[in-house]
Amino acid sequence: MKRKLSWMCAAVIGLSAFPAFMTAAAPATPPLINAEPTEPAPSPATEAPVVAQTAPSREVKLTFAQIAPPPGSMALRGVNPNGGIEFGMRSDEVASKAVLNLEYTPSPSLLPVQSQLKVYLNDELMGVLPVTKEQLGKKTLAQVPINPLFITDFNRVRLEFVGHYRDVCENPASSTLWLDIGRNSALDLTYNMLAVNNDLSHFPVPFFDPRDNRPVTLPIVFADMPDLAQQQAASIVASWFGSRAGWRGQRFPVLYNHLPDRNAIVFATNDRRPDFLRDHPAVNAPVIEMMSHPDNPYVKLLVVFGRDDKDLLQAAKGIAQGNILFRGSSVVVNDVKPLLARKPYDAPNWVRTDRPVTFGELKTYEEQLQSSGLEPAPINVSLNLPPDLYLLRSNGIDMDLNYRYTSPPTKDSSRLDISLNNQFLQAFSLNSTQETNRLLLRLPVLQGLLDGKTDVSIPALKLGAMNQLRFDFRYMNPMPGGSVDNCITFQPVPNHVVIGDDSTIDFSKYYHFIAMPDLRAFANAGFPFSRMADLSDTLAVMPKTPTEAQMETLLNTVGAIGGQTGFPAINLTITDDSAQIADKDADLLIISAIPGKLKDDKRIDLLVQATQSWVKTPMRQTAFPSIMPDEADRAADAQSTVTASGPMAAVVGFQSPFNDQRSVIALLADSPRGYQLLNDAVNDSGKRAAMFGSVAVIRESGVHSLRVGDIYYVGHLPWFERLWYALANHPVLLAVLAALSVVLLAWVLWRLLRILSRRRLDPDHE
């Protein structure tokens, strides 16, 4: 893991890729341009790892569609000439070759040669692409060799457009100054693996490397079919790695007594261990050991040892909660003692709902709340909220905004625009004197996950589980220009804007109440299981003899929930005895098959059994997840039973028959290929977005959801809020009750006035 000695091996491979400068263009075929590389000399103090000649290598193609800001293409302009991409390099790898393949189209109005595209890596100039006469207005292909000596753990490739459309008196804001970078542009990299020491002080590297932007794939190995305690230990570890993976995604393939050809986690006890550990000495305590793969020294295994299953659980909790103390090739987990009980809705990845939250707490990187440039880039703040936050009657969300900015050059010409989930919210002028740089706002919102109605509140700004608050500082910048005889020239100065870390937003005044079943809340936020971040209110129901695919489904699911909450499932309960589910006050997560006690429940709208399946369909199906049909449209119209040989999986949600405040989520599949489809859907954000309602059917064609059957409610509302909620979706009844209330109030006032009038006219009358 340490990078020592010299960069010579990587340098020889990297420099051999640098071709000579060429320019050629044909009208019919996009030209391929090879940039003349600039060769900045690396610092003599630079250290590089020793790469063995036999070290494995891998080739990576990072397209702009994957790693550039959406939509992947870039429009470089005169006033906004910079664009770029970011990528990381694992600490157990070194780059030996890198080539940037660009696809771009320059404006036909540019002056050839004077206009250029400069390519930087970590602020070191890598190459220059002059715009030639033949390229103007045409798609151009170019290759820029990247010196691998300058590739570090975290890297930025910056593209700088230098554009000119005339020799004198240019206007940088001219619409003719542009160069578009295509989303098919790509960075081609060759990585060589490094030999890594068995040292846990770097944990979780190499099993999870935060510099690696790819989804985490971490196989879990058992000696044979795991019992319940081993399933629980593996779930704790998987959910912890999921909490670290976060937005990357995660997958945990399960293997019985078989080692993969990549980094993996292995569970073993003295009595039950994989064959490759047969000669390993017995342990007398919970032990976590890092060792090399027996067939590949570049692959590492994290072995969780124990005398018995109890030791495995303790070791798993040590990984989840005590890994900061790890060092050496192995550690003994002596004890893991809980000190404070978790509270509902305290997931680290969720915005706190018990007090106002500062924007500093919401930052994910240091410079997130500031921006610079003639046109500063938008400042974005993510708000991950519990999906059951009840906002139906909310007057708005209080936000105390503190911001600083460069004074606008002209008065009443610049403004701050605030948007929520791509919907415009409010605008404020940027004063040149900065007399007002603090705002007390109330963000008007509409509940997005409760009932989807849009006739209750105006404006209809939807607030869901995942939200994006955006601040756009828009400056009216004076630009040089004029004519050749009367030219106005000056150097435009970039603007700087900052949202203060002490700005706050307050979600502490709201109840928790949601209409269920709602598979969208499960797919986006792991709800209802994520209500307790440690899954202490969750009971997972597994088959008595789980297959590798069924175990993978369990680990992928708890890993995904860990990624959404940011906390491991240290208190998850797992059972394979359906008789226990009736006695447990918990939400049920069912893997593989619905227990016999529940199969005849009328609340179930779909069942998958081997090659046969049946489903209930509603009277009328809505096309969009955000539209909540009324009770008549949701009613089951028909039940169809089908026998087929093709694979299918499903996610089904319904109310628990044992507790009306608890829910059941069942993950079902009919075959090994069905489980593969199910796991792909759980790990694919696009397919998860297609899940809503009470039933999600997963086939080779994709995910199709239904909203069918009765709705039930989870959470608590005061009686007056309950009354309003019941009437909010029945405007006629609300109008009738309002009219009756007015008549009753008028009659009471009339009677009071009559009594007062009699007393005034006849004081002796009682």
From Swiss-Prot:
Pathway: Glycan metabolism; bacterial cellulose biosynthesis
Chief place of localization: membrane
Stretches of the chain found on the membrane's Periplasmic side: 29-729
Any single Gene Ontology cellular-component annotation: plasma membrane
A GO BP annotation: UDP-alpha-D-glucose metabolic process
Pfam assignment, any one: BcsB
Cell location: Cell inner membrane
Protein's job: Binds the cellulose synthase activator, bis-(3'-5') cyclic diguanylic acid (c-di-GMP).
Assembly description: Tightly associated with the cellulose synthase catalytic subunit.
Protein name, UniProt field: Cyclic di-GMP-binding protein
